[in-house]
Design a protein with these regions (language model features):
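Non-heme di-metal
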Residues: 1-184
Length: 184
């Protein structure tokens, strides 16, 4: 299905830019966490980085018929300080997407009857809620100079849903089967 509405296309481009930056930022913060003795928080950053890549890929795929150059305006958290501040930046970014960005984008796509964009925004919004919880939990431990105790993290390759320890039988967001989840 081809996009018909410029506003939804602009929102997809903006979300693509933001998710792409989050993907790289989380990889940088993963390296920092690992170098500073927090290997499991590093794993969490890597897993959620992959989830952000999934979101960016989904948004990009909806834009497949939008050929040409475009300037993408997307906000992003910058800085590489310490584990607690990096986790706060990650949490704040997720909360911004949950409370401000994706609800507007989702309602606009719904109103404009852009079903593919609506699905992409729904997947991202739903997954970001889990990401925020995971970052907050990790930050609470890091404030006590403790690493998380996750031995495995699983990410849905379709919607970016992220869960610790064991993947569900099917993704609660998109329904994909457990055996397709990527393990970190």
């Amino acid at each position: 299905m081809s996009l018909k509405n410029a506003m939804t296309a602009d929102f997809l481009r903006s979300a693509y830019g933001g998710e792409s930056m989050a993907h790289i930022r989380y990889l940088v913060w993963a390296e920092s966490a690992e170098k500073n003795g927090f290997p499991n928080i590093g794993r969490l950053f890597r897993a959620i980085s992959y989830a952000e890549w999934v979101h960016a890929r989904n948004h990009f795929n909806v834009l497949k018929d939008q050929v040409g150059d475009a300037t993408v305006a997307a906000g992003g958290v910058f800085g590489l300080t310490n584990i607690v501040e990096n986790l706060q930046g990650a949490f704040d970014g997720e909360v911004h997407e949950i409370d401000q960005m994706y609800p507007v984008y989702l309602e606009t796509a719904r109103f404009q009857e852009e079903k593919d964009a609506e699905r992409s925004f729904h997947y991202a919004l739903s997954a970001e809620k889990e990401h925020a919880k995971l970052f907050k939990k990790a930050q609470d431990l890091a404030k006590q100079d403790k690493d998380t105790d996750n031995s495995k993290i699983y990410v849905c390759p379709i919607c970016g849903f992220t869960v610790e320890e064991e993947a569900p039988e099917k993704c609660p967001i998109c329904g994909v089967k457990k055996d397709l989840f990527k393990e970190f």
